[in-house]
Amino acid sequence: MQALEPQPPLASLDHEGLVISLGTFSKMLAPGLRVGWLRAPAALMRHLVVAKQATDLHSSSLAQRAISELLTRFDLEAHLATLRATYRDRCHVMADVVTASFPEGTHFECPDGGLFLWVELPRGLDTLALLTTAVTRHRVAYVPGAPFFVDRARSNTLRLNFSNCQPAAIVDGIASLGALFTEALQRELPAAAL
């Protein structure tokens, strides 16, 4: 399977009407566009509509009209192919810079889909503790990995988003993070050796 190759929806395998499919336009059109879609068996749809109405009455009419126009006038498949290629290229740029600039012992895998690189740094680094320095001194943000774990034991992990930045900014930002993590690890090594 190629990276970012679209897979058939799970609902296409459902022959008993048990699968509910939902999605969002935010990843394919605009991150701030909080409009999604839902496909469900008819028996469930009425209940789902009532649940949605109880939550927020309705989604933005303006956003829904804009999406309708886009889907009517533009080739969505061509747009998605361009996005996949763009995201694949940005992911590879980020992976190359992580490999070149992060401390030895860093592990990651390029995703087969999605917009994030999951990174495990050498033990002894705490990405939550380093986040403020990353943002204020290096002007780079990331998501610390510890909150993704029930016991928060993996404080040396982080999630990096490659969807929003141009390749040159990815190179600069990730190299800067690499310098921060390497410097922090060098400070930790003497203490770990005691």
Would you name each region that the model predicts?
Residues M1-L194:
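PLP-dependent class I/II
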